[in-house]
Regions:
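N-terminal accessory segments that position/regulate proteins before the catalytic core
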Residues: 1-187, 238-270
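Small-aliphatic-rich amphipathic alpha-helix that forms the alpha element of a beta-alpha
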Residues: 109, 135, 189, 195-197, ...
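Short small-residue beta-strand/loop micro-motif enriched in glycine and branched aliphatics
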Residues: 92-94, 197-201
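Short glycine/proline-enriched turns and hinge-like loops at secondary-structure junctions
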Residues: 146, 201-203
């Protein structure tokens, strides 16, 4: 009982302290996407984005020091990690609509996202070890005793809680703006942040740390997906309001910060 009371007191204290962090909250709320806003911008920039010269330019370094001494680095070493980094992909060219991900793969993907390691710590770094993120996932396959649907991941028990399995959950056109070649995902991860878990200590700067942590989660998912010959794609084009409504979160205290598609590509062979 005392442990429960201490948690409640800590949460209340964190909430009251975080109320002064208005800059990060204002920024986050004013940069949310909706279908109307995002689609208009995408149409305006389509010609530029499809230009080979533009794509070449974006892959070049911004800074170059021609008058300074240069040192050539060695080629990367061999091993599983370097192989996965080399083979990691974000684009699906030939989606496999009949792909089936078994329960072992599903378990490893959620564990890689935010699970606990052998030292009873999370598998990603977190500023102050505060772990402000929550992991949700839409699973598109039925298993023996496991139904497809929207789930929440509990790292402490390594379990999934079914939140919703209505038809609207699987209609990605309702909450993803652009999903060309991603019409047949196996899993969609939603990474959300409970901001007060970090802002009570770091104030507005906590927002930076939260995004860094979300990036580490997405990279872990990507590497585990590569291990299983899957493609992972981070999606910035979510309709944030629709996603938060589906997750049943308020969008203020807890809000989406990243989305990752997992799919099978017929051309992706390690």
């Amino acid at each position: 009982m005392e442990h429960f009371k201490s948690i409640m007191i800590s949460n209340d204290y964190a909430t009251r302290l975080s109320s002064k962090c208005v800059l990060s909250q204002t920024y986050h709320q004013n940069t949310k996407h909706s279908k109307r806003y995002l689609m208009s911008n995408m149409y305006q920039s389509r010609v530029l984005l499809n230009s080979p010269n533009f794509l070449k330019a974006t892959q070049s370094p911004e800074r170059y020091f021609p008058t300074q001494q240069h040192f050539k680095l060695n080629a990367h070493s061999s091993g599983l990690l370097t192989e996965y980094l080399d083979k990691r992909r974000s684009q699906v060219h030939s989606p496999d609509k009949d792909a089936f991900i078994d329960l072992n793969v599903l378990s490893d993907l959620f564990w890689a996202a935010y699970g606990k390691n052998s030292q009873n710590k999370r598998v990603v770094p977190s500023a102050g070890a505060l772990y402000p993120l929550e992991i949700y996932g839409i699973v598109f396959n039925d298993y023996e005793n496991f139904k497809k649907g929207l789930y929440h991941y509990n790292p402490s028990t390594h379990t999934l809680s079914l939140l919703d399995n209505g038809a609207h959950v699987f209609d990605i056109s309702q909450y993803i703006m652009r999903y060309q070649n991603m019409e047949h995902p196996s899993i969609i991860f939603f990474i959300t942040a409970v901001f007060s878990r970090a802002t009570f200590k770091y104030d507005d700067r906590a927002y930076r740390y939260i995004l860094l942590e979300a990036g580490a989660v997405a990279q872990n998912i990507s590497l585990m997906a590569t291990h299983y010959n899957l493609v992972s794609t981070s999606i910035g084009g979510t309709d944030d309001f629709k996603v938060e409504e589906m997750l049943k979160i308020d969008g203020n205290h807890e809000s989406i910060v990243d989305c990752v598609f997992i799919a099978k590509d017929r051309e992706a062979v390690l």
